[in-house]
């Protein structure tokens, strides 16, 4: 049996759904699953300190290979002792491969079998990223969980294009495995692609499972498809992945999508959504989204969320938060970001309890009604 640096321990399956309660053991600690992972693109979760993230209960955070490669450089981070020491974070770190950022640069990239040529968004210079280079960067960063280099095709791309794309992604995954210098202390995940095509998702999953990665990611979702389309892809994709390994749905952070992903057997999620919207004054609460910058909150001396135990809600009012954000004070962004991250990490804590109690579907229904989602449009 292979000894992986990343292992998944199943604790309990929910009786009525595909949801599973577990934990993932990494070289930098163990975290419970299902788990939402805050995103620290530039080796920092915007406006939050490592101590605050630990208070929130984030046992793992995500950093971005593409951005750290460009600035300050992966070799500099390696000389600093790796990403954990560089950013003073002693818990788990996951790095993406740079594939999604390259996907985002659709107008300035060229994909070949060797890799991707694209323009550096900082200075316009020509850059080249290959499967081997993506692995080398992540080896230098020293993350606990790494991603294979993949192409993320648009969800509505033609079948023939997506077929060629997933076959190339499988070849890239194999090249990445061979290039991986630190398999003893960094777990490399394969990324299943295939847009909305069931047979292509099946082919992609079969290719990657045969390579025996320590864990698997589901990519190519949350890129413009509907909620129902995402759920349909998860319905036929998640069962293709090994039960004894972690399953990670990339780039998903809306509360309803988190719950519906868990129902389909997903263990890990990440998204910039909670911090990005927080900086503009949009806050997630138990009764739906609240835009605290709105004028109606100017003299509202109540907490953001009456049912929230986070530091922000225990100590500050909507009126004060509105004032800070209207005055462009960084402290306001810190407080709203803290709250939104706490909200999603705590939501996953509640989901884990619902799995333990075998009442996840009831929890889902109650949450959607309170949050303001139209349940009929959120069928699963």
From Swiss-Prot:
It holds the Pfam family TGT. It comes from Streptococcus equi subsp. equi (strain 4047). Catalyzes the base-exchange of a guanine (G) residue with the queuine precursor 7-aminomethyl-7-deazaguanine (PreQ1) at position 34 (anticodon wobble position) in tRNAs with GU(N) anticodons (tRNA-Asp, -Asn, -His and -Tyr). Catalysis occurs through a double-displacement mechanism. The nucleophile active site attacks the C1' of nucleotide 34 to detach the guanine base from the RNA, forming a covalent enzyme-RNA intermediate. The proton acceptor active site deprotonates the incoming PreQ1, allowing a nucleophilic attack on the C1' of the ribose to form the product. SUPFAM superfamilies: tRNA-guanine transglycosylase (SSF51713). The active site is at residues 96, 270. One of its GO terms (cellular component) is cytosol. Substrate binds at residues 96-100, 150, 193, 220. The gene is tgt. This is Queuine tRNA-ribosyltransferase. Its cofactor is Zn(2+). InterPro entries: ArchSynthase1/Queuine_TRR, TGT, TGT-like_sf, tRNA_ribo_trans-like. Keywords: Glycosyltransferase, Metal-binding, Queuosine biosynthesis, Transferase, tRNA processing, Zinc. PANTHER family: QUEUINE TRNA-RIBOSYLTRANSFERASE. Its EC number is 2.4.2.29. GO terms for biological process: queuosine biosynthetic process; tRNA wobble guanine modification; tRNA-guanine transglycosylation. The keyword Transferase applies. Residues 251-257, 275-279 are annotated as: RNA binding. HAMAP family: Q_tRNA_Tgt.
